[in-house]
């Protein structure tokens, strides 16, 4: 008699065996790497990388830099710095993560002496992640506030003070008085003139610029900003709720790791382009738009600016930070690629997309600002802003003057939301990837609790940034953590991989993935990796040290303890570089010279993660999947691949 077939609902255990396991649900059946998982599709990876690279800076920093550095002329140093600094580092990090299938800390099995560089990258990413989600919370608040028939910052209201005005305000004027029968003309405060029913003499008025309604709304309503960092105040409850919502969105998108975030980015990475196109089309139809675009990249371009070193420094700095190199995220995201993926073409696509997006965003921004300048009777130079002032003061002010202002405001802030979210996805993935590499068994069983736990801890740490002094904290972290630490990590990354591990050896590793290339293909990359890119990064680092100034927010200086805290944050991030180097040297054997030499050799478990990809060069490497060898081993006796 034939064996009875079991009903389908009895086959759940059998199905689990086929598809990795219920504990390891972030790994798909067809994944090449059944331990860590891979991207479901190539497009998941590309959109995640584009979303990570294209962030808020592309919208609120690049257009202003272009305008202030000669307009269209700025694109020349920008393109040159992309080729000399941005793309070489981007390609290197993508290749590094993909080759070893490891995150930014464990990937330093390539050079155990420099493992602290990876820790520095992750710590800086953590600090930046804390305040970056606060900016997303600001965007959420403004988006919700826009769901009204009239934007709340369109006019001065009960929350504003006497300085709220779109036109200059009279502060003093001359009045005619009679004293003991003698007529006198004296200068008085305008408030005194009004109280005493005097009239200003025509032409005697002294003016000061008024504060736009959008500026007072930002400071008095949205932030409830205190007088300085010394005055913490209370937690602004609606910003705290928006921050919580932002973290809930991030946690929900990452609960299955790259398997879930790789689907969400189809919306978060592509939607900003739709909004930018809509804003550009709308802006181009407005009166004065052509003047704004002319200031941005047209007839106002000043090629004499190319003689100024500041312009080249700004171009290099913008490229370096906008591509998100040396943050650890590129290594983390690339570690989930299949081994034979063409990371070279990916690097080209993402870098070009990032730069073209910056240029495109500038047209959308300046067309609207040109219209704002036109209706207010000002020059474009008087209304253009950068950073927070552009996103939450200048642009909202311009949108408030448009017919259907709430609709355009909702679109704009929803775009900022999506721009921030996919950058945040990659930053959190950097943290969870680091945990996964260090504790793989724990991560398989507890990916969801660990991911949500990270989000919860970072939310709690971010609450200080939604107090009445929150904006000062945001600016402080950005000023210290998102600067020198990243430059130091990038310089040491190049020195370690190219000069110590060996640029030629790294090229051989890369060719195992993308195939052998002719010598002329690598000529450019060798020139950049060995000489040009390190020199540029060192020059930027020295320049930033020379140009360092105490942080301030507007005209408000930071207290001494705030500056000291900023230095403590950056020292905490980079101190792990010497600490880990000392630990590795202590773990090694022999005299100090022998220990140093052994620490500069790859660990015994460095190489392709899967045995099928190791070939002759890595046939003797220790299997990284074995628990005993998962941690970076003592480097004495490390194998040096031929």
UniProtKB/Swiss-Prot annotation:
Subcellular location, record wording: Membrane; Apical cell membrane
Keyword match Ubl conjugation: no
Tissues/organs with expression: Levels are highest in adult and fetal lung, in trachea and salivary gland. Lower levels detected in mammary gland, stomach and pituitary gland, and very low levels in colon, uterus, prostate and testis.
Record field: transmembrane: 45-65, 72-92, 110-130, 235-255, 261-281, 315-335, 348-368, 399-419, 450-477, 480-500, 528-548, 563-583
Keywords: Amino-acid transport, Cell membrane, Glycoprotein, Membrane, Obesity, Symport, Transmembrane, Transmembrane helix, Transport
Miscellaneous comment text of the record: Transport inhibited by BCH (2-aminobicyclo-[2.2.1]-heptane-2-carboxylic acid).
The name this protein goes by in its record: Sodium- and chloride-dependent neutral and basic amino acid transporter B(0+)
